Regions:
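Auxiliary, metal-adjacent structural segments of Zn-dependent hydrolase domains
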Residues: 300, 306-366, 378-379
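Catalytic Zn2+-binding segment of zinc metalloproteases
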Residues: 390-404
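C-terminal, non-catalytic "cap/extension" segments appended to globular domains
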Residues: 10-13, 20, 24, 109-116, ...
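Short pre-active-site segment immediately N-terminal to the catalytic Zn-binding motif
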Residues: 369-386
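Long, K/E/R/D-enriched contiguous segments that form extended
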Residues: 293-328, 394, 448, 452-454, ...
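Post-HExxH zinc-binding segment in Zn-dependent metallohydrolases
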Residues: 409-437, 447-449, 453, 527
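A well-structured
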Residues: 1-308, 595-597
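Flexible, glycine/threonine-enriched loop-and-boundary segments that flank and lead into catalytic domains
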Residues: 342-369, 492, 496-518
């Protein structure tokens, strides 16, 4: 790992995404932006007239959304690779403003549709010529009690940029303005600490390096704690306001009901994970023993327990491994992955000013998905490649097999395809290294960590979100102190039976960007539970299971998300898949103990 982040221009072109596939340059984007704004003004002429020709109004509504998508995506992606680039940030700000203008100009549309007679709406939804829009109309009718009169909808739309402010402030603070102290390396040198490099340091064999990085991150966030608490409070208060304005009982209801996910799924997840905390404690106790520690601290949780085996993988070797591990998905699937590798889909390496983390952006029907990585040469980041490409392939199949109004799959299933890729690749590696005790132990450790960080950790995050929003809904203040206390107590619940829960872990909630997209992190946990089952089916049943899985990938939002998963044979309306996945965690732990004995 380089001690200092490279500048973007120092990274070879084959490891950067190519946004010219969207627009050849910023001038073309400017022209497209002008066209979208003109189309928005034209669409505004429908105000008060939707009832005259509702079918045509629906078509033009979706056409405008499709026209705007590349304008927004180009600006967003352009800004992600250098948050310090004022030109790119200017484009992103203008795209955001465009979104608010369009939302305002189009805000009358759904209320006017909903003012139509129910029988007419049902007739339009049943019209074969309007089949592309039937899912939209079904959801619209279902959301009728939560749609406001046109003038009120317009006011909410005008709040768009204000509502986005907490997330934007958080991003600017953490990606641009915030800097971390250097990490002291064992040889006496120092290395630059960023959110992008933290994952490497926290896995270090050197406990001093781990503690230096952990304290550097947590204490720096803590020094901005009051600011971040105020920022997060703004985000939560907006969630509560939006929910109440739309006549939902809670902010959680407002997030989950439109997705057709019962809140019992959320509650089942927390309940089942709580029941499995003793197994987590068993795993943590084994970690403590294998690491030979008198005390297991929070900065000891990520380093591999198998110290005499190292799987260091360059990006190119990692991608080869992903292709090999995902062969069960079929040759057409692999062909698209190869295209992604060389076709300008992926931005690979960390660089100065680049956003941390990883994501896939799959909204561009006429181009291809884009993937942002911050690749370090380790096994974890190899799985990240498989994970993000799982998102991309889900988008690709949905976009290919569904019309635009039905192609945007639900948040609830958004993590299933990505995590299924990880699980399938893991099974391949466990089989490949079955006779290599060191490698097998290392991989089992990684699999256990995937469960700990994806099921237990994300469920803890989900529980924190529920606590924070419930506090706000009950009129309790969200301050640095109250939020940090709640987060610390959750860490004690999940880890305290075995771990020394360091005081500054109370600051960790401050660095989680997903909290600004409320009630989302739980889908990582439910997604893994579904994905483990899907991967088992694909590997055991072969082609028939792959066909069923492809139906799920291709479903988009044509059917409700629970039903989409049922196409692949998984029923997430019951706690059974969660319980079964946690059973896999227990079995994997037993296997790991046997290997390490």
């Amino acid at each position: 790992m380089a001690a200092k982040l490279r500048k973007r221009e120092e990274i070879p072109a084959q490891y950067k995404w190519d946004l010219s596939h969207i627009y050849p340059d910023d001038a073309a984007w400017e022209a497209a932006l002008a066209d979208v704004l003109a189309s928005g003004k034209k669409f505004a002429a429908w105000e008060g007239k939707v009832a005259e020709n509702p079918r045509q109004a629906i078509r033009e509504y979706f056409d405008l959304n499709q026209q705007a998508e590349p304008v927004f995506s180009y600006a967003f992606l352009r800004g992600e690779t250098d948050n310090g680039d004022s030109v790119a940030q200017g484009l992103r700000a203008r795209a955001s403003q465009m979104g608010v203008q369009l939302s305002t100009a189009m805000s009358f549309f759904e209320p006017e549709l909903l003012s139509l007679d129910d029988a007419l709406l049902a007739e339009i939804a049943a019209d074969p010529a309007m089949a592309d829009y039937d899912a939209f109309l079904r959801n619209l009718i279902r959301q009728k009690p939560h749609t406001l009169p046109a003038e009120q909808e317009k006011l909410l739309a005008m709040m768009g940029q204000v509502a986005q402010a907490p997330n934007h402030i958080f991003g600017m603070l953490t990606d641009v303005d915030m800097s971390f102290p250097p990490v002291q390396m064992p040889d006496g040198t120092t290395a630059e600490l960023t959110e992008g490099t933290y994952s490497q340091f926290i896995r270090s064999d050197s406990r001093d390096v781990r503690k230096s990085a952990f304290d550097g991150i947590m204490n720096t966030y803590g020094s901005f704690g009051s600011t971040i608490a105020a920022t997060y409070n703004g985000s939560v208060q907006n969630d509560v306001f939006q929910a109440r304005a739309r006549h939902y009982a809670t902010a959680r209801d407002a997030r989950m009901e439109p997705l057709e996910i019962p809140t019992s799924v959320y509650d089942n997840l927390i309940s089942e994970v709580h029941a499995a905390i003793p197994v987590l404690n068993e795993y943590l106790a084994l970690r403590k023993a294998l690491m030979g520690l008198d005390e297991l601290h929070m900065y000891d949780l990520y380093t591999p327990m198998v110290k005499d085996f190292h799987m260091e993988l360059s990006y190119d070797k990692a991608f080869d491994l992903v292709l090999e591990g995902l062969k069960p998905m079929g040759e057409d699937y692999l062909a698209k992955l190869r295209e992604a590798r060389v076709g300008g889909w992926i931005d690979v390496y960390p660089s100065k000013g680049k956003s941390s983390g990883a994501f896939s952006s799959g909204n561009l029907r006429d181009v291809h998905p884009y993937v942002l990585l911050n690749h370090n040469d380790n096994l974890s980041d190899t799985f990240t490649i498989a994970h993000e490409l799982g998102h991309s392939m889900h988008s690709f199949y949905s976009n290919t097999n569904q019309p635009a109004p039905k192609s945007d799959y639900s948040l609830f299933v958004a993590e299933v395809a990505s995590t299924c890729n990880e699980a399938t690749m893991m099974r391949h590696l466990l089989k490949t290294f079955a006779d290599d005790k060191k490698a097998l132990a290392y991989l089992l450790n990684h699999f256990l960590e995937q469960f700990r960080t994806t099921v237990f950790r994300q469920t803890m995050f989900a529980e924190f979100e529920l606590i924070a929003h419930t506090m706000a809904e009950q009129g309790q203040p969200l301050t640095r102190e109250s939020l940090s206390k709640a987060y610390y107590e959750l860490n004690q619940k999940y880890y305290g039976a075995v771990c020394t829960v360091d005081e500054n872990i109370a600051n960790e909630w401050m660095r989680i960007p997903h909290f600004y997209r409320s009630y989302y992190v739980y889908v990582y946990a439910t997604g893994l539970c579904a994905a483990v089952s899907l991967s088992d089916k694909i590997l055991s049943e072969g082609e028939s299971a792959v066909r069923d899985y492809r139906k799920f990938l291709s479903a988009g939002c044509a059917v409700p998300p629970i039903d989409a998963l049922k196409l692949a044979g998984i029923d997430m309306s019951s706690p059974e898949p969660i319980r079964r996945a946690l059973g896999v965690f227990k079995d994997t732990l037993a296997q790991f103990k046997a290997v390490m004995a």
